[in-house]
């Protein structure tokens, strides 16, 4: 029989450590909360320095208004804040923080040092270990605050055991800072990672220059600016050209009142505006900043404030769609400046960056079996054979015999083949996708050939994708996809399996990188390959179907359906030619 335990109040340290579990997930969360404090302090120069992806050390320096010596002990108490006085103030916020939880939460699970000074006063240095103030003494310091966080999660080892890799945290910090670069104006940003300058933005750089820095030249070339206001909603941003799209929503940047926000609702509204301009299952790339009345927004939804409730959601959604449709209909002359044009101005020079323009995806395959498909005269077949001969190597022109299967002819999206069972129709796109999937399975990889490319493919990617490819490059090489890094966000593909086209390979690799992570193990990577390959679109208009692929298909049991359930092969029956 269990004994009754008395109800008691938790001590302040335990309360703060529990709160830290909601607010502070990792080093990225620490950087986020501290730079938001800097922004709320009115800083226009913010420097972030990290070691070990922030797991070793985090240092945030700013030139904000600073702390008075007597304010620091109060600020380290939970729910101490200068942002609000009562609950109703939450709905008229002009600050990023308001709960008064971040600083005490971080202090309770780390060894922290705060150096701060207000204008015209001596600085103060305060050392805190596990939420307890160890020392507080005067120090020489200019206006502003420096917060140093060491030994994160040192007193909660269970939390430390769940941390991701340092590389993953570096990636998260980069994404966080890039979002802040886009969301803020007249604020300089600097990030030093492992002793190297990773990001440097001057406060005088304007919005378009910041977009060019984060999103890259390729995005800016044909991008359109938007700045419209209606019904209390202001929409500002840069819209990618309809020809610039991606297989996932990665690359979509959304801000509400200068807060980075994740909103599927807004993303879908933007997608609706592009709907008639994009191939199926492709997503636009954009930077969109919404400015709404404070009373319309509730940011007190998610512990990390990455979501928002919008009071007049449908009105806002309609405004977004209408504004973007109108902008996309603008004459081509109203375009953003390219990076080259920006460099030729007197602005601070920007580094070359990234992003990939993928080719248009062909329409979905929907070939219905029809007896008209076989209504070819001998002359038609002869002409088809001549056309096939003119565009393929000699070894692929003649009728090919093997002990199992004989190639008959190619009819655009399908191939006809014959074996002892009869004549088969082969749906080439589904067949190639299935063979490519089998080639990725390591136990089958020796059956499939890779081809070295005469001119290597260039793949321009985001930093997130670059981390993935640099981490899993060896695995991809083992599977016949030789990929190497030739720039910060540029990769070169030197060889590929023969059954996949160049643009198909690019699309699939981007899908894989978007869904994967640097920490994924080999078993999970295999499952992810299958999942993303199912989503990828293989061209239905491949001009030459290599007959060696047909022999491969028979060698694996001439399956009727692929790994994804798509129809690969069908035996033509006599009943197909009989009148109903």
UniProtKB/Swiss-Prot annotation:
Isomerase listed as a keyword: no
Domain of life: Bacteria
Keywords: DNA damage, DNA repair
The keyword DNA damage is annotated on this UniProt entry: yes
A Gene Ontology cellular-component term: mismatch repair complex
Residue spans crossing the bilayer: none
CDD domains (alphabetical): HATPase_MutL-MLH-PMS-like, MutL_Trans
Entry's Gene Ontology BP terms: mismatch repair
A Gene Ontology molecular function term of the record: ATP binding
Function of the molecule: This protein is involved in the repair of mismatches in DNA. It is required for dam-dependent methyl-directed DNA mismatch repair. May act as a 'molecular matchmaker', a protein that promotes the formation of a stable complex between two or more DNA-binding proteins in an ATP-dependent manner without itself being part of a final effector complex.
Family under the similarity heading: Belongs to the DNA mismatch repair MutL/HexB family.
Protein name (Swiss-Prot/TrEMBL): DNA mismatch repair protein MutL
Encoding gene, per UniProt annotation: mutL
